[in-house]
């Protein structure tokens, strides 16, 4: 029987905090997102990129001036195993992430230094051994 870790991670972000956070990381937990279909279509719908379609969409919606909100109570319980961290590595994954930040830069959503910093962080993270990436996600990013 699997031991359940009841650690809860909330994204305690509001309007301006969501915009600021989105310039570094995904501001929403996709499984618990609700939105108006007309707003998604207005922002261009989901991209056909291989990974991170949700992050691309949230950025497109925020660039279009739409507002987001994080409900301050957990709605979904999710587990993360080592495969989650393995999927967040490799050349293709880095290219997709860097392209997202390039798109954000070209739209004027992030500055050039923000684009460079975020891209460098993604390259380092995806190049790191799986155990180190897992440690960083659990101990640094989810604190």
Where do the PLM segments sit?
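Conserved nucleotide-sugar donor-binding catalytic segment
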Residues: 2, 6, 10-91
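Short alpha-helix boundary/capping motifs
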Residues: 68-69, 89-90, 106, 125, ...
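Catalytic core of nucleotide-sugar-dependent glycosyltransferases
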Residues: 78, 86-111
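Amphipathic alpha-helical repeat scaffolds of TPR domains
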Residues: 115-122
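Terminal low-complexity segments of carbohydrate-biosynthetic enzymes
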Residues: 122-143
């Amino acid at each position: 029987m699997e031991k359940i870790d009841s650690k809860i991670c909330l994204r305690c972000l509001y309007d301006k905090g969501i915009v600021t956070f989105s310039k570094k990381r995904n501001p929403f937990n996709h499984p618990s997102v609700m939105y108006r279909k007309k707003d998604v279509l207005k922002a261009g719908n989901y991209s056909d990129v291989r990974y991170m379609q949700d992050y691309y969409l949230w950025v497109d919606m925020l660039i279009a001036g739409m507002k987001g909100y994080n409900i301050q109570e957990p709605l979904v319980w999710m587990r993360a195993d080592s495969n989650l961290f393995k999927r967040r590595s490799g050349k293709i994954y880095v290219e997709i992430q860097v392209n997202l930040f390039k798109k954000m830069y070209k739209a004027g959503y992030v500055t050039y230094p923000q684009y460079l910093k975020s891209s460098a962080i993604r390259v380092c993270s995806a190049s790191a051994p799986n155990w180190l990436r897992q440690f960083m996600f659990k101990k640094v990013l989810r604190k």
